[in-house]
Swiss-Prot record:
Gene3D superfamilies in UniProt: Peptide methionine sulphoxide reductase MsrA
One Pfam family hit: PMSR
Protein name (Swiss-Prot/TrEMBL): Peptide methionine sulfoxide reductase MsrA
One GO cellular component term: cytoplasm
Gene: msrA
Catalytic residues as annotated in Swiss-Prot or TrEMBL: C54
Functional note: Has an important function as a repair enzyme for proteins that have been inactivated by oxidation. Catalyzes the reversible oxidation-reduction of methionine sulfoxide in proteins to methionine.
Listed PANTHER family: MITOCHONDRIAL PEPTIDE METHIONINE SULFOXIDE REDUCTASE (PTHR42799:SF2)
Top-level taxon of the source organism: Bacteria
A GO BP annotation: protein modification process
Length: 216
C-alpha cells in the first residue's frame, strides 16, 4: 500500500483516490464577517474558485476586496466527493484547497481579483506553497465562464513575462473551465483567521507586481 507521502507531489490515479461520501459536510451558512450566505444560487453575481496555498489566509485576501459578496473555503479539482480536511491532507483526494469567491462584477472586475490572486502567492512552485508541501497547495483558477477563462489565460501570460524578468520560473497554475465541483470544507475552516486571529497564514507572494487590474 502506498504511504501518504507518495501523494505529496503527484495526483492519485484512478483507483487510488479515497471514496468520500455522498452527503455534504455540515455547513453553517452564514459568513462570519459580512453575514451573507456561503452557499446559494447567487443570482446576478459572478463566481470563481482560486487555489493559492493554505486556504485560511487565501480566503481573508478575498473577503477584504470591495465588491466581493461572499467567500467560502473548500476542496476542488480532485476525485473524492465531499472530502474531509484530513482526507485532503493525505493527498489521496487530488483536491486543492480552494476559495470560492462570489462577487458583483459591477463593483469589482475579474481582472482586479486576478491581480489579488497572482500577487498573493508564488504561482511557480508546483505542488507546494512555501513550506506547505502537497498537491492540496497547488495554484489553481477554476472558472465559471469562458470569458473568465480567457481573462485568466491572458493574465497568466502577462504575469509570466514579469516573473521571468524577475528571475522566476514557469507558472504552474492550473486554469480550468468549466470549474470542477466545489466541496465546502468543515465549518471551522470557514473564515478561519477571523475565528483564530493568531492562526497560521503561510501566504507569501513573489513581490512582483501583476500588470493587470490596475485601471479596472
Amino acid at each position: 500500500m502506498l504511504g501518504i507521502g507518495a501523494f505529496k507531489q503527484r495526483m492519485p490515479r484512478s483507483g487510488e483516490a479515497l471514496p468520500g461520501r455522498t452527503q455534504a459536510l455540515p455547513l453553517h451558512n452564514t459568513h462570519l464577517i459580512n453575514g451573507h450566505p456561503l452557499r446559494g444560487e447567487f443570482t446576478g453575481l459572478a463566481q470563481v474558485q482560486f487555489g493559492l496555498g493554505c486556504f485560511w489566509g487565501a480566503e481573508r485576501k478575498f473577503w477584504n476586496v470591495p465588491g466581493v459578496y461572499t467567500t467560502a473555503v473548500g476542496y476542488a479539482g480532485g476525485k473524492t466527493p465531499n472530502a474531509t480536511y484530513s482526507e485532503v491532507c493525505s493527498g489521496q483526494t487530488g483536491h486543492t484547497e480552494a476559495v470560492l469567491v462570489v462577487y458583483d462584477a459591477q463593483a469589482v472586475s475579474f481582472e482586479q481579483l486576478l491581480r489579488t490572486f497572482w500577487e498573493s502567492h508564488d504561482p511557480t512552485q508546483g505542488m507546494q506553497q512555501g513550506s506547505d508541501v502537497g498537491t492540496q497547495y497547488r495554484s489553481a483558477i477554476y472558472c465559471s465562464t469562458q470569458a473568465q477563462y480567457d481573462a485568466a489565460i491572458a493574465s497568466r501570460d502577462a504575469y509570466q513575462q514579469q516573473l521571468t524578468a524577475a528571475g522566476y520560473g514557469d507558472i504552474t497554475t492550473e486554469i480550468l473551465y468549466p470549474a470542477p465541483t466545489f466541496y465546502y470544507a468543515e465549518d471551522d475552516h470557514q473564515q478561519y483567521l477571523a475565528k483564530h486571529p493568531n492562526g497560521y497564514c503561510g501566504l507569501g507572494g513573489t513581490g512582483v507586481s501583476c500588470p493587470i487590474g490596475l485601471d479596472a
